Amino acid sequence: MTALTPNVTGHKGLGSLASRYVDIENLAWEASNFPGVDFKTLLVDPETGILTTLVRMAPGATLPDHEHMEIEQTYVLEGRLIDDDGEVTSGNFVWRPARSRHSAHAPEGALLLGIFLKPNRFFHQDGSQTDFLGRDYDKTWNR
């Protein structure tokens, strides 16, 4: 099994079929590659790209142009998230089909639970394509 929650030492040595309990409050917020967007990784599988993350967006923060490589699911815990297709508000859910592309912003800020089957591909003005952490997408995920 390659799935893990980074920076949680209590999971080391657990059997392959043991449940992994995560104290989210004690996980540190990590900066993304985008201003005003921080995250906590709850689950990641470095081999497949499966990712569950808590995302915190400051008021006015934007997730720039990106493509969902597989189905993406977002539950809004606080605030609202807006894109050209519509708006999802606190307590509501949106999912996006594989290969859908958009940018999204949080005018008043937002707290989101995101579930990804493979990380998003972000498109930059210089022509580069990266993942959420700014790593070259193809080198990282198309091995």
Protein language model annotation of sequence segments:
Residues 1-48, 129-143:
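A short, N-terminal "cap"/entry segment at the start of jelly-roll beta-barrel domains
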Residues 39-41, 52-54, 73, 93-95, ...:
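Conserved hydrophobic/aromatic beta-strand scaffold that supports enzyme active sites
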Residues 47-49, 59-63, 82, 100, ...:
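Short, charged/polar surface micro-motifs in flexible loops or helix N-caps
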Residues 53-55, 64-68, 84-86, 104-106:
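Short histidine-centered beta-strand/loop micro-motifs
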Residues 58-59, 68-83, 90:
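Glycine- and acidic-residue-biased ligand/ion/polar-headgroup-sensing regions
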Residues 62, 92-93, 111:
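Residue-level marker of beta-strand positions
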Residues 82-103:
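Short acidic-glycine-tyrosine-enriched beta hairpin
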Residues 98-126:
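Ligand-binding loop in jelly-roll beta-barrel domains
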